[in-house]
A protein has these predicted regions:
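Helix-loop-beta segment of a Rossmann-like dinucleotide-binding subdomain
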Residues: 88-98, 110, 123, 130-168, ...
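Helical element adjacent to the flavin cofactor pocket in flavoenzyme catalytic cores
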Residues: 142-199, 203, 207-210, 388-400
Length: 404
């Protein structure tokens, strides 16, 4: 017999955005019954727990984008949350360096974008780099971002989950669900139960577009996962103490291989951005799911017809970086303070689940929020989603009529 359960709000997905949404709803509506449901055994198993831990400053994003709207404020609020809860944040700052003369104009454009976004940022001459990060190297100019920092994603997600339950929120794990239409209302169907809610929030990360399609939303979108692999080594004297990033390649929709310092005195290099089939394909065939072949085929077929990204070139250039030596050589263009002979171990990889628009033939780069019937769908909460999570969630709660 199928049991019907009733809630005020049900959130699908116990990542940092799903939990932040639950906290925001309980902050504004403390008497409401709110459930967060997830197919895993604990919060933040995938994107939220496997991201780089970098609190981005907010200068990469187009000034009219949701990413620009929330990243700077999210940086401040996530740091405040960490400080309030005695969680470590390493205020490393970041330099963005030029690898050749062609990067200089793009660097200056990046700086202007940061100014437009109200970010604390400096454009400096190469002779000042030794003062800020002597291990880095640049051509002509570089950007200094003092507010970029590093936190521990797993510790932060755990503390947020504790806050949600302390406020009266409920979790249900080990629960795979699907959305079903019934009498102009969407219900959540699980194994032996059905959930009814005044409002549902689909915050299922890589699976959000799949769930949305079950109730007729977002058929123009497919998910294309990109594998972000890293290598790590013990931090040694002479390694960069700041994060060191390249100027992003305009034909590659990602930030490029960079160096990141961890809270456990390690330095890591990466990530790659290699297109894969599986939404949980963290190793070559680990997590491969043949059911996801269709979306991979549709996404890559669409992008092959597009001038927006060279998907074949991207796959080739990123695939070679899955091997240790080419990845380290790429990072050494940013800093000479890396030794190929150091012990470089694999660091837990992540998946960046990008949405491809089949109609416009582009990889969607901004957050996408759609609502229909009694469901709000968060379809593209990619980087800097972790940094932006608190103000982004507040904006969703305050601006989606279904949640008010």
């Amino acid at each position: 017999m199928t049991e019907l359960e009733n809630y005020d709000y049900v959130i699908i997905g116990a990542g940092i955005i799903g939990i932040s949404l639950g906290i925001e709803l309980l902050t504004q509506k403390p008497t409401k019954k709110i459930l967060i449901i997830d197919k895993e055994t604990r919060p933040g198993v995938h994107a939220s727990g496997r991201n780089s831990g970098v609190l981005h400053a907010g200068f990469y994003y187009s000034p009219d984008s949701l990413k620009a709207k929330f990243c700077k404020q999210g940086n401040l609020e996530l740091k405040k949350f960490c400080n309030t809860n005695n969680l470590e944040v390493k205020e490393t700052g970041k330099v963005v360096v030029c690898q050749d003369k062609n990067d200089v104009t793009r660097l200056m454009n990046l700086f202007e974008r940061g100014i437009a976004n109200g970010v604390e940022i400096e454009l400096l001459e190469s002779n000042e780099l030794s003062r800020i990060e002597p291990a880095a190297q640049t051509v002509d100019k570089f950007i200094w971002s003092p507010t970029t920092a590093v936190g521990n994603p797993k510790e932060i997600i755990k503390k947020l989950a504790d806050k949600f339950t302390d406020m009266g929120g409920l979790f249900r794990f080990n629960s795979r669900v699907k959305l079903i239409n019934k009498n102009n209302e969407v219900l959540i169907e699980g194994d032996g139960y059905i959930l009814s809610a005044t409002s549902i929030i689909n915050s299922a990360g890589a699976y959000a577009s799949e769930l949305a399609k079950q109730v007729g939303v977002g058929h123009e979108y497919v998910c294309l996962p990109f594998l972000g692999a890293y290598r790590k080594s013990e931090f040694v004297a002479g390694n960069p103490k700041r994060l060191v990033y390249p100027v992003p390649n305009p034909i590659n929709p990602f930030l490029g291989v960079h160096t990141t310092n961890t809270l456990s005195d390690e330095i890591k290099i990466g990530p790659t951005a290699f297109p894969v089939i599986g939404k949980e394909q963290y190793k070559f065939l680990d997590g491969f799911n043949a059911k996801e072949l269709r979306d991979f085929y549709l996404a890559t077929k669409t992008l092959l017809k597009s001038d927006s990204v060279n998907i074949l070139g991207l796959a080739k250039s990123e695939g070679i970086k899955l091997f240790k030596r080419p990845l380290i050589k790429k990072a050494k263009r940013l800093t000479n303070a890396l030794d190929l002979n150091q012990k470089w171990e694999n660091y837990p990889a992540g998946i960046r689940a990008q949405i491809v628009n089949l109609d416009t033939k582009v990889i969607e780069m901004d957050y996408i929020v759609r609502s229909d019937k009694n469901v709000v769908h968060i379809l593209n909460a990619v980087s800097p989603g972790w940094t932006s999570s608190i103000p982004f969630s507040r904006w969703i709660v305050e601006n989606q009529p279904l949640l008010n």
